[in-house]
């Protein structure tokens, strides 16, 4: 993390052994002299297992963004850097990342993190690439929708993809629509551009 100078959390060699496989879903625990906490929308610290914004502090933390005082004030509060990433800490202090705060989908009053849905879809070996996002919806506020690229020779249909999700995530997190495309829009670094995905979805509706 650039704003923190280097890493904030890590998994030790022992935590990578077979008996501790569940830890591999986390990004580890804070390194020496660093602290991590999770804050809810009310600014109060969340209980273990409760999702909120990840805030961090440590000796390598930046002083400010160069000549950007307003941007600095938004993220540097009371000696803590607000990452705008969402996640939770378990009872043992391991950090799990749910996704970016700005990417969170609010559908029917429920908070849904695209990364969780994307990870389920990636479990299907016939899906090569996936992007999940919220699309404005008059009834739900936002509708969970997904765009996927299938592997060569796959004949998966959108409905089969939705069916695959059942039992793996809550029903309200299952994409209401799935689009099968030849490719996903990407930026110059090869990262999926969700703004372009959303634009293309709107054009198809």
Language-model features, listed with the residues they occupy:
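Conserved AMP-binding/adenylate-forming
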Residues: 2-95, 101-104, 117-118, 127, ...
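Bulky hydrophobic/aromatic packing residues
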Residues: 1, 49, 139-140, 194
């Amino acid at each position: 993390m650039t704003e923190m100078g280097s890493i904030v959390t890590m998994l030790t060699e022992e935590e990578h052994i077979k008996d501790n496989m569940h830890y591999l879903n986390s990004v580890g625990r804070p390194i020496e002299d660093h602290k991590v906490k999770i804050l809810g929308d009310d600014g109060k610290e969340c209980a273990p297992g409760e999702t909120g914004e990840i805030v961090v502090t440590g000796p390598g933390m930046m002083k400010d963004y160069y000549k950007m005082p307003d941007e600095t004030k938004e993220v540097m509060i009371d000696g803590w850097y607000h990452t705008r990433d969402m996640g939770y800490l378990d009872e043992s202090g391991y950090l799990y990342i749910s996704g970016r705060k700005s990417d969170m989908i609010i559908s029917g009053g429920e908070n849904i993190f695209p990364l969780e849905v994307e990870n389920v879809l990636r479990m299907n070996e016939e899906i090569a690439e996936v992007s999940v996002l919220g699309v404005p919806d008059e009834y739900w506020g936002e509708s969970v929708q997904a765009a996927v690229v299938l592997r060569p020779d796959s004949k998966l249909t959108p409905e089969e993809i939705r069916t695959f999700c059942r039992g793996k995530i809550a029903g309200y997190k299952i994409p209401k629509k799935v689009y099968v495309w030849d490719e996903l829009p990407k930026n110059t670094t090869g990262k999926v551009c969700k703004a372009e995905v959303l634009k293309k979805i709107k054009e198809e509706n």
